[in-house]
A protein has these predicted regions:
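Acidic/polar, glycine-enriched structural segments that form the non-catalytic walls/loops
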Residues: 1-55, 76, 83-88, 369-397, ...
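Aromatic-rich carbohydrate-recognition surfaces in CAZymes
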Residues: 1, 52-167, 184-202
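Aromatic-lined ligand-binding clefts that engage carbohydrates, nucleic acids, or primary amines
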Residues: 423, 447, 455-481, 514
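Structural helix-adjacent loops and short alpha-helical linkers that scaffold large soluble proteins
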Residues: 8-15, 68-79, 138-155, 199-219, ...
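Terminal, non-catalytic domain-edge segments
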Residues: 316, 331-385
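Extended ligand-binding clefts on enzyme/binding-domain cores
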Residues: 11-18, 23, 47-60, 65-72, ...
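Aromatic-lined, polymer-binding surfaces characteristic
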Residues: 16-36, 55, 93-94, 122-128, ...
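An acidic-aromatic loop/edge-strand motif
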Residues: 390-410, 490, 501-538
């Protein structure tokens, strides 16, 4: 077992110990440890099963208890690359990013509006996550030195939460599968605790004036939260929705970070209500559905710090893992009445099972004290490659046109001299509206589409021509009749794909023909292609 028998009894019992042992390896395995140019450890988690993002804030936030427990080097390993990106000139928004790219490429946010717009971002969610995690590291180390490396970003995000956090606008949170929700009470709790964490960081840095200011704001927000979210014997899902409820898992930081912003009666009232509404296999995420998130149940179970309450919420989760008929790695999203997996396989978020251990300062100190790496002096973020457009995509040229058909053409459709007089003409950006990251200018809603266009290639020399493609789903590309590239699955933004040797050899100065076939099976769909020259960063 992962812990000695005395610790198992102390921290939550045998069922909890078995849950922790089951989660431990999966959490670490669902990501990659690497060394930076200075030999310091970095960690990149993968958002398995959903969109495959790398270094996602609202994935490493729920997984963080396992990393925090085992010391500063682990906890900082996933924050350093994220914070370096947030501090770069690539990130221009007043809130924290969502992700670093699509695994395994950490080359910039792809979720929602990416680096371009605020569409479908998670501004309160991500900003709160980072302030809380910085607060947790400071709590562990007894100083705010690590937070000081990124102080301008943390100040900016605290200002954002001060303005937007108490009563969040209609936006997504980490539970984005449930859709947008305005006036989210649990998200508000995250923002309030995040502001408290920032106040504590200010105090550790000796800025007592700012610390007092933010503690005052956090306490006032908490007072209003208690009043405005109250729904009798529990607290609401949304401030404007009486008769609703939700798990308030974000409140754990009020006690772990010793902020003491909320009365203990809040947790007690919530817990009594939770025990009255949970099902055979666990406590639903909120009143809207009967599904739950395993990681959040394990956080919620800790709120009163009472062993009986903890075991009351953990036992149904243990029962689910024993009785579910789904034979897959530990899922974190399942139905609480049927024990059926809804989705999410082998994700790192199950590291959240270890939240219970962060309440015991002696145990946390014991395991964190085993950190022998003492990571420091991380290398600067690598300079990104420069990209020069050779033939534009729809993003650069909204008026560019392609010839296209949705009827299977003759077998030589990709040859340079193929007759496309019977094909249609449409503006670049083919797909269905609502597809993530897509700028649709010509609707395509069938299973397949074939595209062709001519382009002129200036005289070289060209050292590193690559395909720039946004595809949903599988695509194959030909240049002057030669196979140039294939791209499986889907992306939510443009990616650069190396050209095959045959495609490179077929390119010539002057007139060229590019031909594309894209196949769609389910969900959104989109295809757009261009060529770029990549110059390596220094």
């Amino acid at each position: 077992m992962l812990f000695r028998s005395s610790e198992r009894g102390q921290l939550g019992g045998e069922q909890y110990a078995e849950l922790a042992a089951l989660a431990y390896r999966q959490c670490f395995a669902a990501g990659k440890f690497v060394a930076d140019a200075n030999g310091q450890p970095l960690h990149f988690c993968k958002e398995n099963h959903s969109n495959g993002c790398i270094g996602t804030s609202d994935v490493f936030y729920p997984m963080s208890p396992q990393f925090l427990l085992f010391g500063p080097s682990l906890a900082k390993s996933f924050l350093v690359p994220f914070m370096n990106y947030a501090a770069s000139d690539r990130w221009k928004f007043p809130f924290a990013p969502h992700d670093l790219g699509t695994y395994p490429k950490a080359n910039g946010q792809v979720y929602g509006g990416g680096e371009r717009t605020e569409e479908n971002q998670m501004p309160v969610e991500e900003s709160g996550n980072l302030l809380l995690l910085m607060g947790a590291i400071a709590q562990m180390e007894g100083n705010a030195d690590f937070a000081g490396l990124y102080w301008p970003q943390l100040e900016k995000w605290a200002e954002y939460l001060k303005a937007k956090g108490l009563d969040p606008e209609n936006q997504l949170c980490t539970d984005d599968f449930a859709g947008h929700l305005a006036h989210n009470v649990n998200l508000s709790a995250k923002a309030i605790c995040g502001l408290g964490a920032f106040a504590k960081l200010c105090a550790m840095r000796g800025d007592n004036t700012k610390a007092e200011e933010y503690f005052r704001i956090a306490r006032e927000f908490a007072r209003r939260w208690v009043k405005e979210a109250d729904d009798g014997d529990h607290f609401r899902l949304a401030f404007d929705k009486p008769g609703t409820w939700s798990q308030k898992y974000n409140l754990i930081w009020d006690q772990i970070l010793e902020l003491n912003l909320f009365p203990i009666d809040v947790a007690r009232k919530e817990m009594e209500y939770y025990k009255s509404v949970q099902n055979r296999y666990g406590l639903p995420l909120d009143n809207r559905e009967t599904y739950t998130k395993l990681d959040w149940v394990l956080w919620t179970a800790t709120l009163t710090r009472q062993r009986a309450d903890f075991e009351a919420l953990v036992e149904p989760v243990f029962r689910f893992l024993n009785e579910t008929r789904d034979r897959s790695p530990m899922t974190d999203w399942y139905q609480t009445k049927t024990a059926k997996k809804v989705g999410f396989t082998a994700r790192p978020v199950v590291g959240g099972v270890f939240a219970q251990m962060l309440y015991d300062k002696a145990v946390w100190k014991k395991y964190a004290g085993r950190d022998k790496t003492k990571a420091a002096n991380w290398a600067p973020i690598p300079r990104p490659p420069a990209m020069r457009t050779v033939t534009a995509t729809a993003r650069e040229d909204a008026d560019m046109e392609w010839r296209y058909t949705t009827q299977r053409p003759a077998g030589d459709w990709f040859e340079p001299d193929f007759d496309t007089s019977g094909w249609n003409t449409g503006k670049a950006g083919f797909g269905t509206r609502g597809t993530p990251g897509a700028a649709v200018r010509t609707e395509w809603n069938t299973a397949d589409i074939w595209l062709r266009r001519e382009f002129k290639l200036p005289d070289g020399p060209w050292k590193n021509l690559q395909l720039r493609i946004h595809h949903d789903e599988d695509a194959e590309v030909f240049i002057n009749g030669a196979p140039a590239a294939t791209a499986a699955g889907y992306t939510t933004d443009y990616e650069e794909v190396p050209l095959d040797a045959a495609g490179l050899a077929a390119l010539k100065a002057g007139r060229n023909v590019i031909a594309v076939h894209c196949h769609q099976t389910v969900g959104g769909q989109y295809i757009d292609v261009g060529l770029v020259e990549i110059e390596s960063g220094k």
